[in-house]
UniProtKB/Swiss-Prot annotation:
InterPro entries: ARM-like, ARM-type_fold, CBPC1/4, Cytosolic_carboxypeptidase, Pepdidase_M14_N, Peptidase_M14. Metallocarboxypeptidase that mediates protein deglutamylation of tubulin and non-tubulin target proteins. Catalyzes the removal of polyglutamate side chains present on the gamma-carboxyl group of glutamate residues within the C-terminal tail of alpha- and beta-tubulin. Specifically cleaves tubulin long-side-chains, while it is not able to remove the branching point glutamate. Also catalyzes the removal of polyglutamate residues from the carboxy-terminus of alpha-tubulin as well as non-tubulin proteins. This is Cytosolic carboxypeptidase 1. Zn(2+) binds at H845, E848, H942. It catalyses: (L-glutamyl)(n+1)-gamma-L-glutamyl-L-glutamyl-[protein] + H2O = (L-glutamyl)(n)-gamma-L-glutamyl-L-glutamyl-[protein] + L-glutamate; C-terminal L-alpha-aminoacyl-L-glutamyl-L-glutamyl-[tubulin] + H2O = C-terminal L-alpha-aminoacyl-L-glutamyl-[tubulin] + L-glutamate. Its EC number is 3.4.17.-, 3.4.17.24. It is found in: Cytoplasm; Cytoplasm, Cytosol; Nucleus; Mitochondrion.
């Protein structure tokens, strides 16, 4: 029973004896001992081949067996002994895996093998068996030795292996390991160049050939070796010069035609890998086009599409075609905005100065040479949001590590005498209320400021004339002279025929903050606007006021009259006039259809291959408004000349496909993201494809289930005035339109991105509006504020005033909301004045319209008559700036004001002329601090386009230091953890809020943002940015659903409720409980300090931890990860190589980010 064990122990002890004997013979090293050494090594080889335990004994570190064997190999000159030792090593490294191979490398085995290879080649003819053994071992060792390439070159082994392969082209047994070793050699860029000069390409092209079922393993290795060599630009040029690219294309076609059962997909993909590497250089791309490579790969890929297992071929082909697709110029005269607004002064060295100080005649749309010699490595790392554009930084580069800079410092940038002017905006702290009868009082609300000089003719609902709706809409009054037969309708001659079921505003006071989702609008046909009879034209519209208490079409028109825009808009969009009622159903996040992106990319490639099918017809152009566009009645009609509209140009490329170009922010040459435009003259039941072709961000939630929104006028007239999520086949990917270095921050070779979606319209000759997100205009805000003020009750202290005027001459409203004091007694007045201040703001970025909807929810809650709202008003004094950037909102900007700058980057040192809203908002905060009324909470509402859920960014010294790479002890940092209370409350109360997405890290690139400046300079510990997703939620009650206006307004009201609960933790009566609460949070914070998602998502999270798609298409088109310049030449490929002896397919890295 114990015999096997005893035998094993005996064999183990025997091999140890043999190793000792071999070591002794090595030390004696007498020539006469060759026979003895040969005999001992033979016995060891036999034992290793037959006993697993023997292999373990010899290969273990403690036995010293590896050193003894390598020493024998280095010293012996006997052929048979050498073969025996090589056999021993082959057995050890074959079964032992990486551990034994690592031991072999660490003991200098690689150098000994290479020296043996070189010395054996000097005595021709070389022994075939010896060379076979050496190369078989090198194949195993090479990928594990990080310096293998350098060692091979220094020992002179490169040409030895190459010559051996050259003279054994028909000897497949020896040729295979030679090619495998050459593949490992070539992973070093210097070696690849050297082998190319020595004729390696020519040798490999003698092996690579047309379809054959023989020696497929050899062919695969040869192709992989060739691909490795072609990573070198010099070798790629050599391949082009010798005409190898057409040869590869012909070989690929031959394999494609003959491999009908798809048994050799790996070989076909390897051929594509060679083509891909050649096209990494400009000369290669040119040769590819000249060899009809686009057509060849397009046709073969099209034939592969029905077979799912051929996706790797389609993906690689797509990558090559997109890389070789010629860069196109955006069809624009300039990338600067169509509209120009002269500034009072232009700061030297700023972005606007750079924009307008370009030499005359400079083309800012595309560079003279937009292609670099090497392909672009996609390093776009533009980040989102609150505070964007951090550049290309590693995880800890942007985190502030200077404790002195992190500690809040209250700075008096202006003397108090200058700040006294803001006392006017804080009258609640000085009013005595002696003249108010508290038994029968109403809040004194100043009337809305209406300047008759600002009134201009306004025409309601817009679009180009459409046969189906021409009798339902008033005519447009244009700034251009009218033809004699045109008779414009005066605004005053239009009356709104409301339905009889409308309700008075007074009946809706107590329902504020809640939309009546299930209310029905009585249907009925609409006769529309009669312009050919009668003295008065009547437009019957749905009575949205019955559903939406704060919307009044007539009042909206009055508000539009006093709104100043740079283009001088005289038109009103239907959705803004009719209003939007939130849907009473949930809209799920769109499930991505497999292959949709690939299909869109192939359709783009067809433009080059079948260029005669492209119409290229301009149907809308803001750059050329004076010249009429030809219209055959078949094209869609576009318009964006209304408040917040943004569409610069529309080009019909196919019968039902349109390329759309967005306008830059005014006084800027980029920020193309927000869109809002109108479409008419459509056919029902037809799939229309729209491509927005000048997007700039490197990724988007459109890749993760977000849809555009659409408003149908026909549906609104029929009783459904809703913005709805729409669009299928939605994806976002890099296109072939070049971005100039002027627009890309000095970087050359950049491209724009396409956001594409497909829509099928339901009604003939409808008028539909499309937007990036639910529009919320400045005029809509003014309307809502006036309706809110009209609904104010005696218990509410409400004051609305303009803090300042914007650059464009629009007022920036400031609201003060709290509860009236119970009486005019000193005690009640003192209680009134001692309430903490809450400062809220929103819409500093015009394209983040969701922040306005959240603010609307907060305002409606604050003005409602619910007990919670009354309690909240009694707890705090609210200072609210609902729109920090009215000019940007009005003029359809995405991020900037008329100054051409991101206002959320100006809080450190705002300019009174260029950034008046920020200047005066900061001054008001400074006044509050100077008078001892520093806000308890500051929160700036934002929107986030590349993350889901609602979350917050705050400021913490401890958490910032924890996330930095500086070894700083935080034990001595005393920090009140109260900044975490409000986010934690929100996570418990608001379904859309995600605490795990919050971050409290302070970054250097954010030092000029509202959140950081108010925390650092004003001393507000609870200073936040609250980000609301533009897409939807992936957790909680709304998981899997896109977000709508009702959810956003709910978030605003829940924020107010969280402030009410926050009072418990900040009230002096609750300090004991508050301290224990903070202790719990301290422990919780320590538990989570090492969780990766605590790092600031504002800077580093690009893909928002979204799951990868099954569709492995690289949206960037030019991903070239293997050419990472940061890696050492010897480390660039060696460490990642698969086992060369395996024919398994190399993993394809062209995955969608």
């Amino acid at each position: 029973m114990n015999k096997p064990k005893m035998a094993a122990e005996k064999s183990a002890s025997r091999v140890l004896m043999l190793l000792s004997q071999l070591e002794r013979l090595n030390e004696e090293s007498r020539v006469s001992d060759n026979d003895a050494i040969r005999q001992v090594t033979g016995k060891i080889l036999h034992l290793i081949q037959t006993q697993e335990k023997t292999r373990k004994e010899v290969g273990s570190k403690g036995s010293g067996g590896m050193e003894i064997i390598l020493s024998s190999l280095e010293n012996t000159r006997d052929l048979q002994t050498t073969l025996n030792i090589l056999g021993i090593l082959n057995e050890l490294l074959t079964v032992g895996g990486g551990r034994r191979t690592g031991l072999f490398v660490s003991k200098g085995g690689t150098a000994i093998l290479l020296q043996l290879l070189v010395s054996s080649s000097k005595d021709p003819p070389a022994n075939e068996e010896l060379m076979l053994h050496i190369h078989s071992l090198l194949v195993k060792v090479g990928p594990k030795d990080r310096k293998f390439g350098v060692k091979a070159r220094l020992n002179g082994a490169l040409n030895v292996t190459l010559n051996l392969a050259k003279h054994n082209l028909q000897n497949y047994k020896l040729l295979l390991p030679c090619l495998q070793v050459l593949r490992v050699y070539s992973s070093n860029s210097v070696n690849a160049v050297s082998l190319g000069k020595s004729g390696a390409l020519e040798i490999l092209f003698e092996i690579v050939g047309p379809f054959s079922k023989k020696s497929t393993t050899l062919l695969k290795v040869a192709l992989d070796t060739l691909a490795a060599l072609l990573k070198s630009g010099m070798n790629a040029r050599r391949a082009v010069d010798r005409g190898y690219l057409p040869t590869l294309l012909a070989i690929y076609q031959d394999w494609h035609r003959n491999d009908t059962r798809h048994r050799h997909v790996i070989i076909r993909k390897s051929i594509l890998g060679c083509i891909k590497n050649i096209t990494n250089i400009k000369l290669g791309r040119k040769a590819f086009i000249e060899a009809s490579g686009m057509r060849i790969l397009y046709n073969t890929s099209t034939e592969c599409l029905p077979v799912r297992t051929l996706d790797p071929l389609v993906n690689t082909s797509s990558l090559i075609m997109r890389k070789c697709f010629p860069k196109n110029r955006l069809p624009l005269p300039t990338i600067k905005s169509v509209f120009l607004y002269p500034l009072p002064h232009i700061p030297a060295g700023g972005p606007v100065a750079q924009l307008y100080n370009q030499p005359p005649g400079v083309d800012d749309v595309v560079d003279e040479s937009d292609e670099n010699e090497a392909t672009e490595v996609d390093t776009e790392n533009d980040t989102e949001n609150e505070e964007d554009d951090t550049g290309h930084k590693t995880q800890n580069d942007d985190i502030e590590t200077d404790i002195n800079k992190l500690r809040p410092k209250q700075m008096n940038t202006r003397p108090f005498e200058e700040l006294r002017v803001y006392e006017h905006f804080c009258r609640e702290f000085t009013e005595t209320f002696q003249d108010i009868d508290f038994e029968d009082s109403i809040s004194a609300i100043p009337p809305s400021r209406v300047n008759s000089e600002l009134h201009r003719p306004i025409i309601i609902p817009t679009t180009q004339s459409s046969p189906g709706l021409q009798n339902r809409r008033p005519l447009r009054e244009s700034a251009l002279p009218l033809k004699p037969e045109q008779s414009p309708l005066e605004l005053d001659s239009i009356s709104i025929a409301k339905r009889p079921d409308g309700r008075a505003d007074a009946d809706l006071v107590c329902s504020l903050g809640h939309l009546i989702l299930d209310a029905a609008v009585n249907g009925g046909s609409v006769d529309g606007c009669q312009d050919d009879g009668g003295e008065q034209s009547v437009l019957e519209v749905p009575d949205t006021a019955a559903l939406l208490p704060l919307h009044d079409p007539e009042l909206y028109l009055e508000m539009v009259k006093s709104t100043r825009s740079v283009p001088g808009y005289t038109e009103v969009a239907y959705p803004d006039y009719f209003g939007h009622v939130a849907l009473n159903l949930r809209e799920p996040i769109l499930e991505r259809v497999y292959g949709v992106q690939r299909t869109k990319i192939f359709q783009d490639i067809e433009r080059l291959i079948h260029s005669s099918d492209i119409l290229d017809k301009v149907v809308y152009d803001l750059d050329n408004q004076s010249s009429p566009l030809t219209d055959n009645g078949e094209s869609l009609k576009f318009n964006s000349k209304f408040e917040s509209g943004n569409l610069r140009k529309a080009i019909q490329v196919r019968k039902f496909e349109y390329d759309l170009i967005l306008n830059s922010d005014i006084n800027s040459n980029h920020y193309h993201q927000w869109f809002y435009f109108e479409v008419g003259n459509m056919r029902p039941g037809v799939r229309y494809r729209f491509n927005i072709i000048n997007c700039e961000k490197s990724n988007s939630q459109f890749n993760y289930g977000m849809q555009v929104i659409m408003y149908s006028v026909q549906e609104a007239i029929n009783g459904s005035p809703h913005w709805v999520r729409t669009g299928s086949d939605i994806c976002y990917y890099k296109n072939h339109f070049a971005r100039s270095s002027i627009a890309a921050g000095g970087q050359k070779g950049k491209s724009y991105f396409t956001m594409t979606f497909t829509v099928t319209f339901q009604h003939k000759d409808d008028v539909c509006y499309f937007a990036y997100h639910y529009p919320y205009t400045y005029s809509m805000l003014k309307m809502h504020l006036q309706k809110l003020s009209a609904l104010c009750t005696p218990e509410i202290y409400y004051r609305q005033e303009d803090l300042c005027e914007t650059l464009g001459g629009n007022g920036c409203p400031l609201l003060t909301i709290t509860a009236m004091p119970e009486s005019s007694s000193d005690e009640h007045i003192s209680q009134f004045r001692s309430r903490p201040v809450i400062f809220l703001s929103a819409r500093v970025h015009p394209g983040e319209t969701n922040s306005s909807w959240v603010m609307k929810g907060s305002l409606e809650f604050l003005m409602s008559c619910s007990p919670q709202a009354q309690s909240l008003r009694q707890s705090y004094i609210f200072k609210i700036m609902p729109m920090l950037n009215p000019d940007g909102v009005i003029n359809g900007n995405h991020r900037c004001s008329l100054s051409g700058e991101d206002l959320n980057r100006q809080w450190q040192n705002p300019n009174a002329e260029l950034h008046p809203t920020i200047y005066h908002a900061k001054s008001l905060l400074q006044y509050l601090r100077a008078t001892g009324r520093t806000p308890l909470v500051f929160c700036d509402y934002h929107g986030h386009s590349r993350k889901k859920n609602v979350f917050m960014y705050g400021c913490s010294i401890k958490e910032t230091m924890w996330q930095s790479s500086v070894n700083t002890s935080t034990c001595d940092l005393n920090e009140d953890l109260g900044y975490r209370t409000l986010p934690k409350l929100l996570s418990q109360m608001a379904p859309a809020f995600s605490l795990s997405s919050c971050s409290f890290v302070v970054e250097r690139s954010k030092e000029a943002t509202a959140r950081v400046v108010v925390w650092r300079e004003i001393g507000v510990q609870r200073s936040y940015t609250m980000e609301s997703t533009l897409c939807g939620c992936d957790q909680g009650k709304y998981k899997g659903l896109q977000i709508g206006t009702s959810e956003l307004e709910e978030m605003g009201s829940q924020f107010c409720l969280a402030l009410l609960r926050l009072r418990r933790f900040t009230s002096p009566l609750e300090l004991h409980n508050h301290n224990s609460h903070l202790l719990d949070m301290e422990n919780e914070l320590i538990d989570t300090r090492h969780i990766p998602n605590i790092t600031s998502p504002t800077t580093y999270v690009l893909d928002e931890d979204e799951p990868a798609f099954l569709e492995e298409v690289d949206y960037s088109a030019e991903s070239n990860d293997e050419n990472d310049p940061e890696l050492e030449p010897d480390l660039r490929d060696n460490h990642a190589l698969p086992d060369p002896s395996s024919d398994s397919e190399l993993s394809h890295q062209d995955s969608l980010t």
